[in-house]
């Protein structure tokens, strides 16, 4: 493991300890513990697939990593459930690579990382050991005093906004890439209570004006069971769903 990557892993651990102490162990363990202030749009156009994430511990992206507890990973798939066509190790073979990434709601750009290279696709399905940064290129947007979105793994030098700039829901802010700790091109999306990437508390993400349906071949491409509890919570999404925005005109 590279020294820089190890350093960031230690930052994650330190951030977790800091958050536990700062918030006195008052984490968000359920969507019933927090009422979102904003309803978000999906940060992209077209139809995408939820490959990771949910609102229960069983379906969580990373339950023990507090900022990512309610995070999601999105990819684009074809009718067979494949995320690429052609050479698996060629980034350009992936359907989502280079697609526009959008602001999920109105807000102010708080932080940007824009100069990390795309990582290689490894034949063993693991992440690139030379990854210089876990989150890769990313944008953090302040939507309210208590809600910030972070979008990770963006294409190098594709970010079109600057710190301090205000954005509107649906504005193009970057393109999908493969920077950071990732096995293939995808969008990582999370809502957190501060702008700190490592020491914030992850918040449930409530979406509005989206179309969602379970991918009919889910069980053929993913052997992880789905939670019945997931399906009872309106507005919250979970892995296995195909999603798209109905409209980007709704406001906060």
Q: Language-model segments: what does each one mean?
A:
Residues 1-24:
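Cationic-aromatic interfacial patches
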Residues 48, 101-109:
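Generic structural motif
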Residues 51, 108-110, 192:
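Conserved positions in beta-strands of structured domains
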Residues 95-96, 106-155:
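Zn2+-dependent peptidoglycan hydrolase active-site motif and core
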Residues 147-170:
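Short histidine-centered loop motifs in beta-beta connectors
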Residues 160-162, 178-185:
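Short glycine/proline-centered loop/turn elements that form peptide/ligand docking sites
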Residues 168-180:
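Short hydrophobic beta/alpha edge segments that flank linear recognition/processing sites
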Residues 190-252:
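Acidic, glycine-rich catalytic/binding loops that coordinate metals and/or anionic ligands
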